[in-house]
Amino acid sequence: MPSDNFIDKAFSAMSDVVMKVIPTDQKSKDAFKYYRSGMAAQVDGNYAKALGNYTEALALEEDPFDKSYILYNMGLIFANNGDHEKALDYYHQSLELNPNLVQALYNTGVILHYKGEQAEEAAELDEAERFFDLAADFWKRAIKIAPNNYSEVQNWLKTTGRVGVG
């Protein structure tokens, strides 16, 4: 998409200016460069390259808030590749550093809900309910932070009677 390309180029140009203007050490600048390269590779679908860049960024980054976004993006890659356990691990790590990272809360709920659906299909109803309840807990935390988002989730919580649970 041309508009996405324009946005990426504008973001890169602004990032370069910010990194030159704001006083920061070389390690932080390098971490940000790896993070930015990881984002570009992720957008292009080159997940191996993205993970490599994110790993380098994670090793250099000292700010817990920034680390949370690196970990979150790594989780996205694993989720996109169907490795839900690794995705959950990275989402949990990101939430340990940034408990209000609403995207990680939401995506954790998505994976847990999916696991609930799988358990339901396998007629493991107690296990399904456990996963659905866990998904509801994460989604309610996300909705508390962003109450105007996730209308489908809010409807699911209401229709399943999980609005007040947890």
UniProtKB/Swiss-Prot annotation:
Gene designation per UniProt: ycf3
Sequence similarity: Belongs to the Ycf3 family.
UniProt TPR repeat ranges: 31-64, 68-101, 116-149
Compartments, as annotated in UniProt: Cellular thylakoid membrane
BP GO terms, sorted: photosynthesis
Classification via InterPro entries: PSI_Ycf3_assembly, TPR-like_helical_dom_sf, TPR_rpt, Ycf3/AcsC/BcsC/TPR_MFPF
Swiss-Prot/TrEMBL keywords: Membrane, Photosynthesis, Repeat, Thylakoid, TPR repeat
This protein's record includes keyword Membrane: yes
Gene Ontology CC terms, in alphabetical order: plasma membrane-derived thylakoid membrane
Record flagged with keyword DNA-binding: no
Any Pfam family matching the protein: TPR_1
Functional description taken from the UniProt entry: Essential for the assembly of the photosystem I (PSI) complex. May act as a chaperone-like factor to guide the assembly of the PSI subunits.
Record membrane topology: Peripheral membrane protein
Gene3D superfamilies reported for this sequence: Tetratricopeptide repeat domain
Protein name (record): Photosystem I assembly protein Ycf3
